[in-house]
């Protein structure tokens, strides 16, 4: 928990800010005193969210419909934010799309849809705001939401894995290249955080009744929205001013559990271990 008004005076753009994790992060930013622009393609959802968050937090939130795949639309969204708030301090690239499928069943268009939203959208927003910050000699902070499999890949979500890996490379590359301008670039790699839209696409029936996403997490639970919002708020605040080029995993230990060759032995009962020990002593 950051102190009250830890983000006072800052203006933050959150793509995909109308629902799910984007909304949760926006809520906390507002509670900490920031002004926030939320953007997605669905203006009705954005306006409903903005009205609810104004009432809930008393903060200033601007809803702008924007297709991040289109650079001109991104530039217009940023310009409108400057008109409203006078400055932009933080860009949070959160817009995403995902679904599960054997790769050979995908059309090239299905691949393009995900890569265009996740990778091209993040690049468009980053380039547009970065150009303005550099021209105006203003420091800034970029925070990208990736995923744990951005580093190692994952079967059956190849478009998302490819796009998120690209965003991860973008994060680390610009952390070095733009540091001289006072621009920090970091990322968060969440594990399982249940959201209504993504969850239904990644765990449709019959998978939902057969797979327990929490089962592979050592803490034996999925993440809570506020936990991710806490981390995001820290990374966009001045308290993390020396953090640059980092990808922070927040997954309850799931990634490490899957990486260890013998981690699955956790399922063995004490009796099974007794048998193994007796066998090894022979």
Model-based region annotation:
Residues 16-20:
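Conserved glycine-rich cofactor-binding loop
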Residues 92, 179, 184, 243-245:
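Short, small/polar-rich loop/turn modules that mediate ligand/substrate recognition or access, typified
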Residues 102-103, 107-115, 213:
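Substrate-binding pocket helix/loop in short-chain dehydrogenase/reductase
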Residues 106, 153-162, 173, 198-201:
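Active-site loop-to-helix junction immediately N-terminal to the catalytic Tyr of the SDR YXXXK motif
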Residues 126, 163, 171:
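Active-site helix of classical SDR
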Residues 131, 135, 176-180, 241:
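Alpha-helical segment proximal to the catalytic Tyr-Lys
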Residues 187, 208-243, 250-252, 277-282:
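C-terminal helical subdomain
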């Amino acid at each position: 928990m950051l102190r009250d008004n830890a983000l006072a005076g800052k203006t933050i753009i959150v793509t995909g800010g109308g629902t799910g994790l984007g909304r949760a992060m926006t809520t906390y930013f507002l509670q900490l005193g920031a002004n926030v622009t939320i953007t997605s393609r669905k203006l009705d959802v954005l306006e409903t969210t903005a009205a609810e968050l104004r009432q809930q937090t008393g903060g200033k939130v601007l809803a702008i419909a924007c297709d991040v795949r289109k650079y001109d639309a991104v530039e217009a969204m940023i310009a409108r934010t400057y008109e409203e708030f006078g400055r932009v301090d933080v860009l949070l690239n959160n817009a995403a799309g995902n679904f599960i499928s054997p790769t050979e069943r995908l059309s090239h268009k299905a691949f393009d849809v995900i890569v265009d939203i996740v990778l091209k959208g993040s690049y468009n927003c980053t380039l547009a705001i970065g150009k303005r910050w550099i021209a105006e000699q203003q420091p800034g902070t970029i925070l990208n939401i990736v995923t744990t499999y951005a580093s190692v890949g994952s079967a059956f979500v190849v478009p998302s894995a490819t796009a998120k890996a690209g965003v991860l490379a973008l994060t680390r590359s610009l952390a070095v290249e733009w540091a001289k301008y006072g621009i920090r670039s970091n990322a968060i790699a969440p594990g399982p955080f249940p959201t209504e839209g993504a969850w239904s696409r990644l765990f449709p029936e019959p998978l939902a009744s057969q797979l327990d996403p929490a089962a592979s997490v050592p803490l034996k639970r999925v993440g809570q929205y506020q936990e991710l919002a806490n981390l995001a708020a820290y990374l966009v605040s001045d308290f993390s001013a020396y953090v640059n080029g980092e990808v922070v995993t927040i997954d309850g230990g799931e990634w490490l559990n899957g990486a260890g060759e013998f981690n699955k032995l956790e399922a063995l009962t004490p009796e099974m271990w007794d048998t193994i020990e007796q066998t090894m002593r022979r």
